[in-house]
Amino acid sequence: GECCTDCAQTAAANYC
């Protein structure tokens, strides 16, 4: 999957 720019700040970092 793609990694977002603010992944480090969001829970989404788990799937990025």
UniProtKB/Swiss-Prot annotation:
| Note on domains (UniProt) | The cysteine framework is I (CC-C-C). Alpha2/8 pattern.
Alphabetized UniProt keyword annotations: Disulfide bond, Secreted, Toxin
Q: Which named protein is this?
A: Augerpeptide hhe1a
Q: State any GO CC term.
A: extracellular region
User: In its keyword annotation, does this UniProt entry include Transferase?
Assistant: no
Task: Give GO MF terms, alphabetically.
Answer: toxin activity
Q: Which domain of life is it from?
A: Eukaryota
Q: What is the lineage of its organism?
A: Eukaryota, Metazoa, Spiralia, Lophotrochozoa, Mollusca
Task: Give the location in the cell.
Answer: Secreted
